[in-house]
Amino acid sequence: MTRRALVSVSDKTGLVPFARRLAALGVELLSTGGTQKTLAEAGVPVVGVGDYTQAPEILGGRVKTLHPRVHGGILYRRGLASDEADVKARDIPPIDLVVVNLYPFREAVAAGKPFETCVEEIDIGGPTMVRSAAKNSAHVGVVVDPADYEKVAAELEATRTLSAATRFYLMKKAFAHTAAYDAAISEYLTAREAPEAAPAHFPATLAAVYTKAYDLRYGENPHQAGAFYRAAREPEEPSVAFADVLQGKELSYNNLLDLQAALAGVMEFDETACVIIKHNTPCGVSTGRTAGEAFARARECDPVSAFGGIVALNRPVDEATASELTSLFLECVIAPGYDAAARAALAVKKNLRLLEAPRLGAARATWRRRPEEGRELRSIPGGLLVMDRDLGSVRRDDCKVMTKRAPTEQEWKDLLFAWKVVKHVKSNAIVFAKDDRTVAIGGGQTSRVESVKTAVMKAALDVRGSSVGSDAFFPFADGVEEIIKAGATAIIQPGGSMRDAEVIAAADKAGIAMVATGMRHFRH
């Protein structure tokens, strides 16, 4: 039978109705600080923990519930003779239900509060009570989520106690709650540079907090279950995870992956640009005078693959752009915004998912990345691979001309465009670019020469006179020879092959230009 409950919550959602239902069952309520005040003002009978323990709060409220009469009442094992003797000797009544959620530490961090303020929001007594109650779940219920108030109240009203199954369910939630809380603290401190020294680039222990945003219909395939988890803090750069979904069907696992690929690609450009993604790799990229023109030019690169694609634009969508978008079946569009006319035009495509990421419209120089946002995580069974995100870029001055002929001004422009795109194509990656757009893309092949052949074979536009980007060096001259045969006139690649001399000789023989970046962009 539940006779006594300790209630101390920061999130007071649903608190008073829940407490009233407990009080109506004859449950004695113990409470502290703001929770006690809220209950008393609502007319709910409540006993202050200080009165209960005869030990007033000290240290400005830092010590309230850390007392044997509290934790003894929570932790004692009913029916165990030695525990029964201890609580009897010390006059410690049982506490059968603990209702606690923790100080808003994550909210303080998200609000950008000073370090000292965030530290004060690290809860001590709350997690201790939650863990004590969860450990003793054979006898005690612990509620950390207001969403469980109805379930707990209804069961107590029906049976005056909580079943073993309910207590176990609550125990699991409680330990997940405190684990996430501690991980948030660790993540915050890991990302913060200590006054005396910078932190290790990769910490010895990696703690990260993600909360389930929603279940997905399935994972990559229908036989795989899936869910989407969101970080505690919104990044200061454009983010699919925090974008607003304005219309369309629910997002799928594959939609989210493809949207991220599209967003990452379009974020390379200051100019008005469009990226079209299919199966997590670009099938068309272009800049334009308007967003609509950028989309139309990108679509022309590979109109077959663009069907059913995912589109990212770095400028707001107007009616003219919306008209272009509705000319093709698309799965998703992400952009900084949509005007009213565009929304009306796109509304006819009821299944088209529209996402709005306002920060995408801001100047790239204004985006900031916290240390944890500069990392990329991928799991393997039994482990986690962690690396810096590939945010590398090059300027013209970073490149070394490898051939006798240097690129022309137009070739330089096309080369740097191709280099921005090729880092987002699955390796081995080849991109033909001309006049600020891709004209052919080949990727995902197990040899570089085959990626060149694939790009040329799939090209819907004329590749003659284009410039080519390669995500890694050419191990043999065959890839360069195929590029020459296709009619391209310049190449940008990392360089560094054992056969660089052979590759350069092939380029010089054909009179094409080649530059080395010294930077590789493998993508697996």
Curated annotation (Swiss-Prot):
Catalytic activity, EC: 2.1.2.3, 3.5.4.10
The keyword NADP belongs to this UniProt entry's keyword annotation: no
GO biological process: 'de novo' IMP biosynthetic process
Hydrolase among keywords: yes
SMART domains named in the record: AICARFT_IMPCHas, MGS
Pfam (any one): MGS
Residue span, MGS-like domain: 1-144
Taxonomic superkingdom: Bacteria
Domain notes: The IMP cyclohydrolase activity resides in the N-terminal region.
Protein name as annotated: Bifunctional purine biosynthesis protein PurH
Species whose genome carries this gene: Anaeromyxobacter sp. (strain K)
Source species taxonomy: Bacteria, Pseudomonadati, Myxococcota, Myxococcia, Myxococcales
UniProt gene name: purH
